[in-house]
Amino acid sequence: KKFIDLVQLFASNIQKDANGDPCIFFNDKLAPVMAAKATYIEPLQNAGIKVILNVLGDHKGIGISNLTDDQIEKFAAILTYIVKEYGLDGIGFDDEYADYSTPIDPTSASKLVLKLREKFNAEFPGERKIIQMFQWNYASNISAAAGAEIDLADHGAFGPNVFQTSSAFAGVTNDRWCP
């Protein structure tokens, strides 16, 4: 029996391109892993371990909680391309370190989850790609519809609340919380 069944590549960063739209950045630690998927990613998958890419803020004023509808469409397309290009099993979101400079849209993270699920379903018919969410910052306010599309959720709680017994994300059932 496997001790580990999922690896999250930590972390890619959401940044802005020259037009202010979201793009993904692989830092100097992650880029070599992504470039050598046959060495690092595929052996894990061949052993039955799912591999997902984490998307984290990068102090650039943009994150999953302040995207416009147009940016959500573009970013979901980018993430779907990355999953296909690198043969990944899904995407994980972490709303830390965005340093939001534009107003927060409380529906942005929900819309992104729903759009990403739509694009995953279109690109990978019959295969459910993983969407993971870290319960932190503004992403804690996702809708029940978006929560229903999240496969794995991580508590953003530490200390005495680390073992919460109920879902803090609307639509996420207790069986989808990571241990």
Q: At which residue positions do the language-model features occur?
A:
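Chitinase-like catalytic core of GlcNAc-active glycosidases
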Residues: K1-P179
